[in-house]
Structure formats: structure tokens, C-alpha cells
Regions:
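Non-catalytic structural scaffold of enzyme domains
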Residues: 1-206
Length: 206
């Protein structure tokens, strides 16, 4: 299921404070209801399992698992498993994502015990990452590919072994104007949706 909270008008920037705020808790429940409806449709269609190609939507993962008796592949967890195969413990791992994904800690949940997650500073988040995501949504991929570079360079200077592209739009911004050869050689980047797709194919073939 797509599972984007924004698709039903819910902004995820402050959702991590939901237990202290009734309005935010209401928004959380609204998104959960929408996700459950999508999962129910897939369950009725006799799907073997569910994948959610939205990073932020995994903030609802635990509640979904409790209510939907169907396996759901956890994308951040799959990225963590993939990272363990290529990076030593305590390595610095960069994360480019929306503020919603960063604030809800869907990647911290898996990475914090073994790695040091590095995020862009506030200025780069607003003026590089957020704008790049917005430009891709607007169809201006060329502008996105330019404006994301400062955030990438920041993480490289922080000696990150890998950089997680934790938003669906970011691989488009980074790879759209590169040849297939250059994309394959860009080993520093981790595309969660590609990792999720591979995990889904492996699970389906079992």
C-alpha cells in the first residue's frame, strides 16, 4: 500500500509528540485508520504479505501488525539488515529524509544500537533536503538534483559509510540524470524502496 500520511492531509512533522497532545493523537489515529483500510483490502484480495513503500508510514507499523493478521515487511528493518552486511558496527550512517521520518525515529529504532545515524543540520534540512523533495513532487527533477548536493556533501564530510535515501523522491533527485553505470557505482547510497522490493521478491519466492 502507498501509505503516505500526507495523502489524507496529515502532516507528520510533530507526530512524535502524539502522547502529549490530543490533537496529534487524533491525527495519528486518522492515519492508522486509513492504513488499516488499505491493509484490509489487500488481505481480502488474499495477498501473502504487505509492503509499505513509505518511510514515515512505518511509524504505524507496530499498531498495524497488532490489528492485521498478515505479515508486513518492515522497510527500515530491511535497510538495517542490508547495512549490517556491508558496514562495521559503530560506523556513521547518513540519513536523508523528511522531517516526519527523522522526528518519528523509524530508523533510529534499528540503527541506534549498532550505528551512529547522522542527519543534515537544520539549515540543510530546510534548504536542501526539504526543497529537493518538493521539487521532485513538482516535477522539477533537475532543480532537485542540484539542491540536494550540499546535504550529501555534508554527510560525506561527516565520514558516513552509507547514506540512506529515506524518502521516495530522493533516489529520483540523485539518480535521474546519471547513467546506469554511474548509478551502479554509487555504492554509498542505500535506496530503501529498492531494498524493500528485493526483500519482497525473496519472500514471495519462498
Amino acid at each position: 500500500i502507498p501509505g503516505r500520511p500526507e495523502s489524507i492531509g496529515v502532516q507528520t512533522k510533530n507526530l512524535s509528540n502524539r502522547k502529549k497532545n490530543k490533537k496529534i493523537e487524533k491525527k495519528y489515529s486518522l492515519v492508522l485508520k486509513s492504513l488499516l483500510q488499505g491493509c484490509s483490502i489487500l488481505k481480502k484480495s488474499k495477498c501473502k504479505f504487505i509492503v509499505i513503500p513509505c518511510n514515515t508510514a512505518h511509524y504505524w507499523y507496530d499498531d498495524l501488525i497488532k490489528k492485521i493478521k498478515l505479515p508486513i515487511i518492515n522497510m527500515p528493518k530491511e535497510v538495517f539488515i542490508h547495512t549490517k552486511k556491508t558496514c562495521k558496527k559503530t560506523s556513521s550512517i547518513g540519513l536523508l529524509a523528511t522531517e516526519g521520518t527523522l522526528n518519528t525515529g523509524v530508523y533510529n529504532k534499528f540503527f541506534d544500537k549498532s550505528y551512529k545515524l547522522i542527519f543534515p543540520n537544520i539549515n540543510l534540512q530546510k534548504n536542501s533536503v526539504n526543497k529537493a523533495i518538493k521539487f521532485v513532487k513538482m516535477g522539477n527533477v533537475k532543480a532537485a538534483s542540484k539542491i540536494i548536493k550540499p546535504a550529501i556533501n555534508y554527510l560525506i564530510k561527516k565520514r558516513c559509510k552509507k547514506i540512506i535515501l529515506g524518502c521516495t523522491e530522493l533516489p529520483i533527485a540523485i539518480f535521474a540524470f546519471k547513467s546506469i553505470k554511474k548509478v551502479k557505482s554509487s555504492k554509498i547510497f542505500l535506496d530503501p524502496n529498492l531494498i524493500l522490493a528485493n526483500a519482497a521478491m525473496k519472500k514471495y519466492s519462498k
